[in-house]
Amino acid sequence: MDLSTADLADREGPSVRSCDVQLRNYGGRAVFSGRIRTVRCFQDNALLKQVLSGPGEGDVLVVDGGGSVHTALIGDLIAELGRSNGWSGVVVHGAVRDSAVLAGMEFGVKALGTNPRKSTKTGEGVLDEVVSFGGVDFVPGEHLVSDTDGIVVVASAD
């Protein structure tokens, strides 16, 4: 999608679905978009690693980590899995780590903050269900656009 989040907000008007949570850019690609896939997990990244290990086809993985910054859900190794498997980027309602490496990676990464502490790896979590944060429902199959102004979700890429 070639429209910026500001242009999408103007087009959608008062009904625009823009994320109110102020997520920071950590990846080397500040502008990214794609079809939404979702993971809900809390301080455990095994499931999202599994998802990013598969073909991304330009999709964006939205991770609802419950807003916890106690442990990082994504670091350089998992981000590289996503990048090399064709994912456009990840949006994490939680923390990341290896931020200096992420900044040099041609991959979109947005998150609440950083923490060097690694997460558990039990595989707890849920795939491809609607996740909600920042006043937005992230619906699998809908389209997400992320840039330096924020995140907007639209029903389709048209």
Curated annotation (Swiss-Prot):
InterPro entries: RraA (IPR010203), RraA/RraA-like (IPR005493), RraA/RraA-like_sf (IPR036704). It catalyses: 4-hydroxy-4-methyl-2-oxoglutarate = 2 pyruvate; oxaloacetate + H(+) = pyruvate + CO2. Substrate binds at G75, D76, L77, I78, R97. SUPFAM superfamilies: RraA-like. Divalent metal cation. It is an enzyme of class 4 (lyase). One of its GO terms (molecular function) is ribonuclease inhibitor activity. Coiled coil: none annotated. Keywords: Lyase, Metal-binding. Signal peptide: none annotated. One of its GO terms (biological process) is regulation of RNA metabolic process. Its EC number is 4.1.3.17, 4.1.1.112. The keyword Metal-binding applies. Its cofactor is a divalent metal cation. It comes from the Bacteria. Homotrimer. Belongs to the class II aldolase/RraA-like family. Catalyzes the aldol cleavage of 4-hydroxy-4-methyl-2-oxoglutarate (HMG) into 2 molecules of pyruvate. Also contains a secondary oxaloacetate (OAA) decarboxylase activity due to the common pyruvate enolate transition state formed following C-C bond cleavage in the retro-aldol and decarboxylation reactions. This is Putative 4-hydroxy-4-methyl-2-oxoglutarate aldolase. It comes from Saccharopolyspora erythraea (strain ATCC 11635 / DSM 40517 / JCM 4748 / NBRC 13426 / NCIMB 8594 / NRRL 2338). The lineage of its organism: Bacteria, Bacillati, Actinomycetota, Actinomycetes, Pseudonocardiales.
